[in-house]
Amino acid sequence: MSKIIGIDLGTTNSCVAVLEGGEAKVIPNPEGSRTTPSVVAFKNGERLVGEVAKRQAITNPNTIISIKRHMGTDYKVEIEGKQYTPQEISAIILQYLKSYAEDYLGEPVTRAVITVPAYFNDAQRQATKDAGRIAGLEVERIINEPTAAALAYGLDKGEDQTILVYDLGGGTFDVSILELGDGVFEVKATAGDNHLGGDDFDQVIIDYLVSQFKQENGIDLSKDKMALQRLKDAAEKAKKELSGVTQTQISLPFISANENGPLHLETTLTRAKFEELSAHLVERTMGPVRQALQDAGLTSADIDKVILVGGSTRIPAVQEAIKRELGKEPHKGVNPDEVVAIGAAIQGGVIAGEVKDIVLLDVTPLSLGIETMGGVFTKLIERNTTIPTSKSQVFTTAADNQTTVDIHVLQGERPMAADNKTLGRFQLTDIPPAPRGVPQIEVTFDIDANGIVHVRAKDLGTNKEQSITIKSSSGLSEEEIQRMIKEAEENAEADRKRKEAADLRNEADQLIFTTEKTVKELEGKVSADEIKKAQEAKDALKAALEKNDLDDIRKKKDALQEAVQQLSIKLYEQAAQQAQQAQSGAADKKDNVVDAEFEEVNDDK
């Protein structure tokens, strides 16, 4: 049975881990990094993922970053005349993680646990699941990032404790409060903001640099795409540096030009200035912290430990704000970049039966219900209800002789239906005509362990039933998913062929180089005819390389290898011959030795 990998599919960075020998291990990517940038680029028909894609983002407009922010929406990105959904772009990242996990494990990987922000709604969860399928992964479970972090932290902790997980990622923010004890991880409350993260902290630095430059030079850098990308890189670097030092130098030469020549951006950013610029963002994270405590019916004194997740929690102002709000130092014993993937791998182990005695009780982050008369939102399942769960309620008709009922399914916390997120609509038809208020329509909501919603409506009079698994407006149909799976497989095959071709060209180049070296060494030691054969084979391979015909390169490479082998054989034969001659020469000398007679002379005679 194949291993279940744990994947943290992040806004900025992604990470993959696996359970080996009862311990979760983070799998490094081919560059040796333990996290991979969630960046995809298209260049000359080739797909680049991760660090290589991020490196060329400045010069390549076909580079896609932070696609996770668009999951569950109908947003599409157009690249080289083709439209891609967020699910497809995410699938390219997942495919890359899957491929290097397979290289590490030495076996195919088909099953995964993927994490999502706790505050992701149904559409966003469904989109994540679809992305996994497109990448060729059976998504065994979707789990919340803070819950995964708690799993990674609490696996070896014996005592009962209440922990608050503060997860500030690249594009999303979550807070979850969990109770740990006897292998049970129970989520008591969760709150968050799907549009707040490290990217926003970068943005305040970018805005500051743009306004400074405009003040000094009268040029708006935000209108220049390439300058903006350079600013983004510099802002991210400065933000990271200010976690360790109190000031940093930002230097961007030739960022723009005017009639007098090139212009450079040179400035010093202090930690104090950065804290002033980002104070409103830090304060925004405190709202969900207070909300989660209130929902769980707890005070800050009830929290035993605060776990930090996400690279942005390294910002000193963030840590200071948490300390002020909760009255305790955040726990620093986990790596905020890796802990979520490790937790996902542990959950994979639980599903596969490798990890025993762990029960994970998660909650739904938002209330679910339907629209009723007057546009009111009637909740059936309150937020922070433990999942999986099921809830039914009986409704009736609003008009006399009404034969169909529209079921409008919503997710959110606002009292009016129009202010909440529509998950889907369906109709229950063929209701026998009757005065209003007489028919009995039972609506049932089911939420599975992945947090995905199923709704059904039943006419209790006729037992007629209608049900849907919620497909958001951005949801993909089965045909679309199958088409995307096929395309992803074809692309993976094309990528494999491209790599094979590159390897073949490298081997051919290497062989040409070694042949030239060998020929130089053997000149005068083997016959000119043999050397000529090798030279001709080498020139033929060079010509094939220039034409870029792979089959021809393969043939010519084999021919040159054969010629070089022949040269080596000839060299060894000659060396053996010479050694033989030397030996027989030594034997002849021995035969020509003259035995001399001698006589002893006695001087005493």
Curated annotation (Swiss-Prot):
Residues 579-605 are annotated as: Disordered. GO terms for molecular function: ATP binding; ATP-dependent protein folding chaperone; unfolded protein binding. Keywords: ATP-binding, Chaperone, Nucleotide-binding, Phosphoprotein, Stress response. The modification Phosphothreonine is found at residue 172. Pfam families: HSP70. It comes from the Bacteria. Induction: By stress conditions e.g. heat shock. Residues 594-605 have a biased composition (Acidic residues). Signal peptide: none annotated. Belongs to the heat shock protein 70 family. Acts as a chaperone. This is Chaperone protein DnaK. It comes from Geobacillus thermodenitrificans (strain NG80-2). The gene is dnaK.
